[in-house]
């Protein structure tokens, strides 16, 4: 059976429907940065997702080609994730999605080196005839965070965030969202195929002890 990050690391991908504390270690990602309303058809955000999956599957399917990745094992491509912020507000203003800035990411297995990533960029560019110059190798260590499973529409996230904020305050922490630690979402459902009320999204915020 292919290694499934969601099942093997449930503490990061399958939180309960109530807030909980988690310490997230250093991870490597395929990443694309941008600024746009994520709901725009043919917009920058949706194009970024195409780029991410292009590289993710080039790496996954390397097992069938000449480029051998040391330590490779078969795996399920991890879910799409996103770091979100807006320059003009403290937190997230869901009524002005056109102001969203974001880093879209897909987690990389630890065996993928920067050299393997660079090979995948060249290989995908050659095979798919697309421009992958915006795609980067990103390393992040989120550290101490609060997270919660949000069930339902993305537009209903403020209620889950409010519950997280109350949990943070009640337990002697405070939000630590900054230019380097951001609002984080992990998408466990495909919004193109799942009804809004059935979407499952992990929401994660950085925190620090008071």
Identify the role of each PLM range.
Residues 1-210:
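A solvent-exposed interaction/effector surface
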């Amino acid at each position: 059976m292919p290694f499934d990050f969601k099942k093997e690391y449930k503490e990061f991908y399958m939180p309960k429907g109530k807030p909980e504390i988690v310490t997230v270690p250093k991870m490597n990602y395929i990443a694309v940065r941008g600024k746009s309303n994520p709901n725009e058809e043919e917009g920058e955000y949706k194009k970024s997702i195409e780029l991410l999956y292009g590289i993710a599957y080039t790496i996954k399917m390397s097992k069938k080609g000449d480029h051998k990745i040391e330590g490779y094992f078969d795996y399920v491509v991890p879910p799409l994730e996103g770091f979100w912020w807006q320059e003009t507000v403290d937190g997230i203003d869901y009524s002005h999605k056109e102001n969203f800035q974001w880093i879209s990411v897909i987690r990389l297995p630890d065996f993928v080196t920067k050299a393997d990533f660079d090979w995948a960029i060249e290989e995908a560019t050659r095979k798919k005839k697309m421009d992958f110059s915006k795609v980067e190798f990103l390393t992040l260590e989120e550290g101490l965070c609060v997270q919660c499973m949000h069930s339902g529409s993305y537009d209903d996230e403020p209620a889950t965030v409010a519950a997280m904020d109350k949990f943070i305050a009640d337990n002697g922490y405070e939000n630590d969202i900054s230019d380097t630690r951001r609002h984080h979402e992990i998408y466990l459902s495909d919004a193109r195929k799942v009804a809004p009320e059935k979407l499952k999204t992990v929401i994660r915020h950085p925190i620090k002890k008071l």
